[in-house]
Amino acid sequence: MKYEIKRGSSGAEKDTAIVWNEDETRFTSLVDSDDAAYWVDFELDAPIDDSFIMIPACAYNGNRFETVNRGYPPMFLESEMGVDVPVRMAPLPHLEPKGDSFMDVTTGDMATPCVCVLRKSMKQAFFVFFNQESHELNHGVTLEQTGDKLLIRLRAPSKRRLVYHMARMSVEPESDPPMSVKKGDEIVIEHRVFTLHCDSITELYRLFFEKRQVLYHGAPQANLPFSRYWELAEKRMQDHYIEKDGYYAIKAADDRFSKFSNWQAGWVGGGISTLPLMVEGSELSRKRSVDTLEFAGRTQSKAGWFYGIWAEGKIYYDDFEYYGERYSITMLRKHADLTYYMYRQIESLEAMGYEVPEFVKNSARRAADAMVTVWEKYGQFGQFINAETGEIVVGGSTAGGIVPAALCLAARYTGDKRYACVAEAAGELMYRTATQVGVTTGGPGEILQAPDSESSAALPVSYLELYEMNGDEKWLERAKEAAYQLSTWVVSYDYHFPKDTKFGKMGILATGSVWASVQNKHSAPGLCTISPIAYLKLYRYTADVNFLMIMRDIAHFIPQVASYPERPMLTNSGKPLPPSEICERVNLSDWEGRSEIGGNIGGSSVWPEITMMLTWLDIPGVYAVPSRGIVCASDHVNAWLDGGELFIQNTTDFDACVKVLIEDDEKMKRKLGAYWQDMFKRVSVPSGSTVHISANID
């Protein structure tokens, strides 16, 4: 793809010396200045209808969707409800679907500092990768569409015409402080450009993934072994249990301040935390987990739909109390999550030799039937459902991204081929409407249908379940494509937090954190709410080591931001989070204000804790394939192969029990199913020591 490149600076031409090569431009100030600016422009032909623009975690198809003015949390108006609706989002940085427009963002708004453009008719892609900052100020990135021309400007420092804060745009020049330079100071804007043949949007994501893995890396770190986190988490989870109603609440008793803190199906943890608790926990944890599944069945409508919220004997709907019983709204995603995890738990319990109550099995089947019924009526699942009637209130989206996986598990457990048929048909719909078009929406309940990572994270899981169910290679290929797209939400480098911020002082390394959405512009600890198991499965099926590396990055990040007695995470009030608790905020952007970059720890978000529990459950702390020379340490340990032995080193202050999985090509042919924890070896590695075990395959 052809492009023009230009360079410029503020002040007179004689004030700056400019030298460049293919990969960077160096500006040297020849004068003192209190308000210096430097930029590199790329201009290319990119007609709106023939282009796809992606900025990782920031813009998908340029965010060219309908915007509606809503305060947080935004909800659909009655006039916007319906089965076939356009994608809508609150005001945020975007290009317009038609006509000239611009969007100004900073490198703090991106999981990877990069802009990707696909010219569909030409089958050509343009990529420019760049650096985060100069003189401790983030670079700015402008996209400006004028007719068929697209201008991409990389600017040091950022200077936004409109600044984004929590579902609103405003003029705030003070949000972008000026850059002061002295004579002789150097400012570097990197710009690694690639123009490549590219047949499709899915191919664009593959090319991005490959470049991302080569160009960006994080530094190693270790502070809290997975096993130590698990000990703290299981203990704290007992404070979540409500004896009189028999369920694990979303929040602990000392932090239960609203209805949202009691029971929410799926999504942020209801009926999900119970999976690691029943498999890895004590007999008490297992019993209480089964009780919780029975409780979930009691919060199910006659039509089979799980109510979104339950507190103190009362049902609440997923509409922020706008409509109540008029529409009886429940999030499709909540219901689908809980169904998926219920079947995983049913299979796990039976694999461990425990009897599953018939009430739980019937509840799971009713939940699966409800999704089949809505599919048979509408040919889609929608985003919001009337829990009493099963009618779609708001359609479209990828909110049902995990539905094919849930129905695959239902089909495997019950033998009902109807579930398998709907799972496959639904997978085809997800592929056609989300993966192929490069945009997933509808995962969270409070961002309308802005693009998000949560719906993206569900698709590789569903496609892999379809592949394991019927063996059709197309589903493996689609799982790879969905995993490439998901990688755009995962931070690929160690963002430089300002040294005076909480995370700057703590030395938090951002690689592997996962962005929430283009509306809620923060990265977060892990995928909401699922382990990165899809990436392990993809490595086992494809031998692409890049899948292992991104799995490791996601898993490895989470314990960094967990609170524990020896290093509590302090909240905004100065009060420490209880041991094991985690706040979802990994603020790279200033969406909550410049003072909240690397901060704004308001309290426990719960779901990251459950994601870490799932990661301990699902992901081997050390994975090795000796015949290929592969060792991947996701846990907070070092590991290597030498002389037919696997060495594991623990540099943390805590003794570790490390789950180890050693495989060869033959072992990797095994399907993991819903329960694979019996495949792990557990290796004790005392603090400060190195142990070794045989790397031979059992």
Regions found by a protein language model. Name each.
Residues 2-10, 181, 185, 198-263, ...:
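Low-complexity, Ser/Thr/Pro/Gly-enriched N-terminal "stalk/linker" regions
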Residues 17-24, 28-183:
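Beta-strand/loop-rich accessory regions of lumenal/periplasmic or secreted enzymes
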Residues 178-200, 686-696:
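Short Pro-Gly-centered flexible turn/kink motifs
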Residues 222-223, 278-293, 345-365, 408-424, ...:
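Structural helix-adjacent loops and short alpha-helical linkers that scaffold large soluble proteins
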Residues 261-280, 289, 326-348, 391-412, ...:
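Well-ordered alpha-helical segments within folded domains of soluble proteins
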Residues 286-337, 359-375, 379-383, 426-431, ...:
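Helix-terminus loop motifs that line ligand-binding clefts
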Residues 428-443, 470, 474-601, 619-638, ...:
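Non-catalytic carbohydrate-binding regions of carbohydrate-active enzymes
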Residues 637-698:
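C-terminal beta-sandwich/jelly-roll accessory domains of carbohydrate-active enzymes
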